[in-house]
Amino acid sequence: MINKVLAFLCFTTFIAFSCSNQPKKDVAEPTSMHSFNETYRENNLNRIAFPIGGLGAGMFCLEGTGAFSHVSVRNSPEVFNEPLMFAAISVKGKENGAKVLEGPVPTWKYFGSPNTANGGERTSYGLPRFEKADFNARFPFATINLTDVDIPVAVKITGWSPFIPGDPDNSSLPAGAIEYSFKNSGSSKIEAVFSFHSVNFMKKGEGINAIQPISNGFVLSQKADKKDLSNQGDFAIFTDQPSTVVDNCWFRGGWWDSLTMTWENIEQQKLNPVASIAKDAPGASIYVPLDLAPGEEKTVRLLLSWYVPNSNIRLGEDSKTAIKCDPSSGCCASPYYQPWYSGKFANISEAAKYWSSNYKELKTKSQLFSDAFFRSTLPPEVLEAVSANLSILKSPTVLRQRDGKLWAWEGCSDNSGCCEGSCTHVWNYAQAIPHLFPSLERTLRNTEFTVSQNDEGHQAFRSALPIRPKIHDFYAASDGQLGGIMKVYREWRISGDSQWLKELFPKVKASMDYCINTWDPRHKGILEEPHHNTYDIEFWGPDGMCTSFYLGALLSVSQMGEFLKEDVSTYQTLLKSGKKFMQDSLYNGEYFYQKIQWQGLKAPNPIEMSKNMWNSNYSEEAQVLLKKEGPKYQYGKGCLSDGVLGFWLARMCGLENPMDSSMIKSHLDAVYKYNLKHDLSDHVNPQRPSYALGKEGGLLLCTWPKGGKLSLPFVYSNEVWTGIEYQVASHLILMGEVAKGLDIVRTCRERYDGQIRNPFDEYECGHWYARAMSSYGLLQGLTGVRYDAVDHILYVDSQIGDFETFISTETGFGNVSLEKGKASLNMVYGNLDVKKIIVSGAEQPL
């Protein structure tokens, strides 16, 4: 044995020495134990929480073990809301035959999560459960398999909620479902009972709480009280089984009497119906008897629906000149936010009935989407990244007000939304909604240009909620406002609605003119005056990032104007000048940078400007730095990962490169070379380090490979943001650098393998952060697939040879394939009017 150990040590020492002398690979191999887009097991289940719900309707999460958590149905996130709510099975005549239908409790819940110091009371953690679980996601479906030596039943759990591209209403339902399938894996008949149990977690405030009956289930209910109408809420839980027995009121007592007696009922298979009481029922249960012959399989469908029609959310200061809207128009029936579904359904009964009546059809259509998406032959890390981040659309990050308009946070704090107002400079990155739900995306453009923009063309980059005109008392966001102009072009090309463009274009033109007059008053084609941006600071002097937005906006407004036969000569002249300046004065031969300028401008000096800025302060020490280095929070000679972001957005919007392609590619290659780190152990990050740290890898926002790093560079410069990782990756791929782009994607997703972070919650300034939906751009990056509804042209420009991929348009979704240079289209839902196919620049016969 000793000899074997010595031999092993010698062998490993030799291998370690040999590897240390090997040349470093350009592209890192995946290191995660979880294979991309495959099943999660064991420790990779730890942090999984899969959102189930509707667009702007709230959600709950199905965890990797089968547990319920993150119950957020009150128009706000409640990240640590994990009420006592669980399913169970009891097999008659089997020792240890009663189990919670979940895998083992993740160890991080033992100690460290809220309230664990009190022993994890009022949870199901202490109840027997299945030995093993595995989890697989095929958005919007999640599947869990449970096995246990004591239970001769194979259990499959499927959680889902409607998600049908092009059908925003049925994708916005306050509903979800968990299907429990049981297959007798033994050789004899099994008598079992499925059950589901929940406390009344809707109880809140001083109003009456009760548990009410509903067909084959119960409703957890809280009546409104005079102090707070938003406390009103209902949550229905019911099955599709006519044999369902309902206990509407658990045993009432002290300490843990209710759960103790409920578990006794589960173990002994007591099927005793209990009527509802007037108020204060602690919880309720559903029981469904199951007889299974050997090899027989049965499924119990558990339907969940909720109804919380009011909130106390009102954001943004009203404009003093705003015209009060007519409540009959549906624009602002309440001074506070009300969800879209509150206008469709009058109460929980209507919501639950609609869910039950349309269940089969909605599942079929959602399955069509899932099958079409995962039919793709694209790299698994890409399919995982894109689909996992579609979960953001199920999360409380997204709200949809009563009249159907979309509004969103940037992300979610633990108990509230984070960073309000459909923030334009963050939502610039998000490419999913414009393709999956184009009509909803257009409501964002309508809000930006007709509600949040004043007569001078200034846009408030954070819109009010309920959506209405607000005061214009802060700087416009240069990247957000210029990006919005490009996105109008995108929405026009996706929808083919030229009348919409015609009506909106005067506002677009006013916005463009405001940007020119404010940031380029000398008409140089660059943003010279201090300009606010997504880093929550102002850049002083021209820089590559914001100039790329400027040139993209000038190109898009020129093309839209030409279509409408408008005079766009001024914009074209500025575009030409800006290109020349960026090439000649903002490019160092390898990448684009910033020329810091703070003197000789129209703007007052940085000290005066800082008085109206957010979180900026020129102390005595900072004033010394100002004289030495210039304004705080710049990037100067740095290599910025977002340095050509506007050019990426231009391509995502269907525009050509506004700048010399070789220079753009060179910049992206430099970002990959200098900013991607596969081990951050020695990286200094005094900002927000937990996005990526230690042995993890990530793409840094900025580095200074040629020197010139400032004492106080822009405030997030040392961080890693997934949204930027994906946009750089997809842009690299667009430019032909597939291996480099995929390396970034893998490095990012390895951090989200379920062991430490939730694979379905990429966070930045909050959970389910919107910027991460830049991942959707990977589809276009790899395949070049894009449909232009104005010209009825399907574009294909593959970077990976033959493929099959998903496409979603205004009128339907399906798959596009490329085989031996020939493209084909298969629509599985709706239709697509294609009059021409262009493959890599050449027209292909239909």
Where are the predicted features?
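Beta-strand-rich N-terminal accessory domains
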Residues: P23-Y110, S376, V386-N389, L393-P396, ...
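Short, well-ordered beta-strand segments enriched in hydrophobic/aromatic residues
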Residues: G176-N184, G821-V828
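Aromatic-rich carbohydrate-recognition surfaces in CAZymes
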Residues: S90-G93, G97-L101, W108-G120, N184, ...
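Bacterial Sec-dependent N-terminal signal peptides
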Residues: M1-K25
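C-terminal substrate/ligand-recognition segments
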Residues: A177, V288-A293, V300, C419-V426, ...
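Non-catalytic C-terminal accessory modules of carbohydrate-active enzymes
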Residues: G56, S69, N75-N96, V100-F111, ...
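Acidic/polar, glycine-enriched structural segments that form the non-catalytic walls/loops
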Residues: N21-M33, T39-N44, I48, T143, ...
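Extended glycan-interaction surfaces of carbohydrate-active proteins
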Residues: P379-S413, S439-H472, T518-P542, Q583-W721, ...
